[in-house]
Amino acid sequence: LDDRDYVEATTSGSTGIPKQIKLKKQSMVNSALATGDYLKLSPKNRALLCLPADFIAGKMMIIRSIILGLHLDIIRPSSMPLSLTSKNYDFCAMIPLQASKSLVDLPRVKKVILGGASIDGELEAKLQTISTEVYSSYGMTETISHIAMRKVNHTEVHQNTYKALPNVTFTQDERHCLVIDAPLIADHPVVTNDIV
């Protein structure tokens, strides 16, 4: 919390060599609002931060909590984060490994977004049997975390398709790679190396 209009972050390398970039604070606010609208999060909902805050996923959990008025509990990142708390939560972001090792406790969280890696078939099958609403997210540091989501469970038909968040559009470049246009989040289209 300083008077600069940006936050420095390091990219993961998904669009090239990892590098330091500046993310506009207003863009982070816009991303938080889009997630809140998409997941219907409300002020005073209880959220859990169980990811490192030096990466975009952890940073955005903090920003979402501030902007959306969520009550945020912060615990040490662990492969079994829910074993470190006995509370119930409305919202949490995890990586698939954390979810796979937390299946017994996951129903204590109403909504979970999974990112940072794809969800394998075995985990996807196990997630069908729990009460938690689980979403697979697609995004990167350059897009200030996720810009598309796919509902993993509680659907009538298996969903393979990610749905863009509001004000996000997708095109392809000449290599057939994904180009993300998210004007409320990024000043310029983000060209990925993901073939679509």
Regions found by a protein language model. Name each.
Residues D5-L33, K40:
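Conserved AMP-binding A3 loop
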Residues T132-R175, I185-P189:
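Conserved ATP-binding loop and adjacent catalytic segment of the adenylate-forming AMP-binding
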